Amino acid sequence: MGTELLLGNILNTNARYLSRELADLGITVQRESTIGDNQGRLADFVNEAKARCDLLVFTGGLGPTADDLTKETVAACYGDTLAFDEEEWAKITSYFARSGRETTPNNRKQAMVPVHGRKIVNHHGTAPGAWFEQDGRCAVLMPGVPSEMKAMWTESIRPLLLERQNCTLHSITLRVL
């Protein structure tokens, strides 16, 4: 997620990493898309994609700025709302204090978590992830910062997906000369 990816300002290494990780779980990646910071286009994309896919995986757009629209948009598309989480806010303010900075009012946005979905704790930054589910279809939201995304994937998302699987696909590559 993010206009900065569409402009070529940032290389999307998250897509490559997640494609490999999902394949390792036996989950077929049908499409990889980059959506700019536009709520209408994002909502259209989510509604279209969730109609044909069991799992949507998002990275980015969970920050405190006005153009970080992923969480509220996906929540609405999955029939959920967000609520302020005092525990998450305390974690965010503590994170800032440890780095010698103060929070600003826009940082409160990151303490908004799903009412019906699941908050995914971010142990390596200030943007919690989220898990939304509707009619057996899921959306997973992770931070766009690669190190935070990879940690959240390993610590939380991958285990959640493994719990949901009823089989495991193992693949090997044979090189024939």
Language model regions located:
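Glycine-rich phosphate/diphosphate-binding loop of Rossmann-like nucleotide-binding domains
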Residues: M1-S33
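Short glycine-rich anion-binding loops that position phosphate/pyrophosphate groups of nucleotides
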Residues: T3-E4, G61-P64, G144-S147
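Short beta->alpha junction loops
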Residues: R31-R41
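Proline/glycine-rich low-complexity loops and linkers
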Residues: R41, D68-R164
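Short, well-structured alpha-helical segments in soluble
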Residues: D44-R52
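Glycine-rich phosphate-binding loop
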Residues: A51-C77
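Short glycine-/aliphatic-rich beta-strand segments at the starts of folded cytosolic domains
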Residues: R164-L177
